[in-house]
A protein has these predicted regions:
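C-terminal functional extensions of proteins
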Residues: 2, 234-341
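Conserved phosphate- and dinucleotide-binding cores of soluble alpha/beta proteins
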Residues: 2-9, 26-32, 36-58, 158-160, ...
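Structural motif
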Residues: 13-14, 189-191, 220-222, 257
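Hydrophobic/small residue at the entry helix of a nucleotide-binding pocket
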Residues: 20
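Glycine-rich beta-alpha junction loops
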Residues: 41-45, 135-137, 145, 225-227, ...
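Electropositive, gly/pro-rich neighborhoods at or near active sites that engage anionic ligands
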Residues: 42-161, 316, 320, 324-335
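Glycine-rich oxoanion-binding loops at beta->alpha junctions
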Residues: 166-179
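An anion/phosphate-binding loop that grips the pyrophosphate of nucleotide cofactors and donors
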Residues: 185
Length: 341
């Protein structure tokens, strides 16, 4: 995208996990006056889980990854993401240095948000990175059979009954500056990313739904490119949108951006072998989204499907083309939001 082709500059907030928010904020760079990432803090993965114990703090992993993605110093970025091999200290195997740094800063300052801010300043991050909450709480879920699971790792584990609802083990409020960023944004983008453990996890904190309802701009959801084993097995696009609307309440979500690309079968095969299936809406789904009071914006968002990446303790998915995503989100900006037109 040519930055000169955009004659307006808007304030953008992206809500979710580190990967999705990073992708969105890169995509909107040509037309963003400011960019804020509001990041999930309930991860309990191996590196993050241990760092949480060390720092007695919320999950730092997605925050660290987001800061590194926008670092002005590449050496600092690589250092934040550097994972120890455990040589001599097996307990540190796979530990990201940035997670330890945030844990240490939290212990020194007594303030998790300040620790994140110090880390972002050290990296020279070009976007504002905020935790959705500073509460050290646990993500829990009720399954359709009525049983409960505790901890983000268990919530996303495959091979269990479908998820019915999320809740926090210890109810907590959102971080006030994150709520301010949501309310003042011209565009709030929810997703893409793990529907339950990244996107809906952020909504569990007190104040997030209300802030979205009172956002001065447009609230958009970017639907995922594929299903995700353990979270959205068997889901269609409409199922994703319905979950978001159910969590936010009627009249809050303005736009659902949905991918309609149809990649080559050979490119899809490695993903399908891992249980991920392409999401493409049919006309009935598009009509159903509209019936929810949400504007469906269906666009081709994937170009060349890159080879699957080996992610630490996570599963890769098909990534959207940054340019195509940016053009589509600019379309969203040009639409009239619920309060700005």
């Amino acid at each position: 995208m040519d930055p000169c082709s955009f004659d307006i500059k808007v304030h953008v907030a992206a809500i979710g996990g580190g990967g999705g928010a990073t992708h969105v904020l890169r995509a909107v760079a040509p037309f963003a006056a400011s960019r804020t990432a509001i990041i999930a803090v309930t991860d309990t993965g191996r590196s993050t889980g241990l760092a949480r114990q060390i720092g007695a703090m919320p999950a730092p992993g997605d925050l660290r990854a987001t800061i590194a993605a926008f670092a002005s110093d590449q050496v600092i970025a690589e250092t934040l993401n550097h994972r120890f091999d455990g040589a001599g200290v097996p307990a540190l195997a796979g530990m990201a240095f940035g997670n330890l740094l945030i844990a240490a800063l939290t212990r020194v300052t007594g303030d998790f948000a300040a620790a994140v801010e110090h880390t972002a300043r050290l990296a020279g991050a070009s976007v504002r990175v905020l935790p959705v909450s500073v509460a050290n709480t646990t993500l829990c879920a009720e399954l359709v059979d009525g049983t409960h699971v505790t901890g983000e790792f268990e919530v996303r584990a495959p091979g269990k009954p479908p998820l019915a609802r999320l809740f926090l083990g210890e109810p907590a409020n959102a971080y006030p500056p994150a709520l301010d960023a949501i309310r003042s944004a011209d565009l709030v983008v929810i997703g893409p990313g793990s529907l339950w453990t990244s996107v809906l996890a952020c909504v569990q904190f007190g104040g997030v739904v209300e802030a979205l309802a009172h956002c001065r701009g447009t609230v958009a959801y970017v639907c995922n490119s594929t299903t995700q084993p353990g979270q959205t097995d068997g889901y269609r696009c409409i199922d994703h949108v319905q979950r978001i609307v159910a969590a936010l309440g009627p009249g809050v979500l303005d736009v659902a951006l949905i991918n309609r690309s149809n990649p080559d079968a050979d490119a899809l095969r490695p993903y399908e072998e891992e249980g991920l299936h392409l999401l493409r809406p049919d006309e009935d789904e598009i009509a159903a989204v509209r019936a929810l009071g949400v504007m469906p914006l269906v666009r081709e968002l994937t170009g060349y499907v890159e080879p699957r990446r080996a992610l630490w303790n996570k599963q890769d998915t098909i990534r959207y083309d940054t340019g195509a995503l940016g053009v589509a989100l600019h379309e969203v900006v040009m639409m009239k939001g619920k309060t700005n037109g």
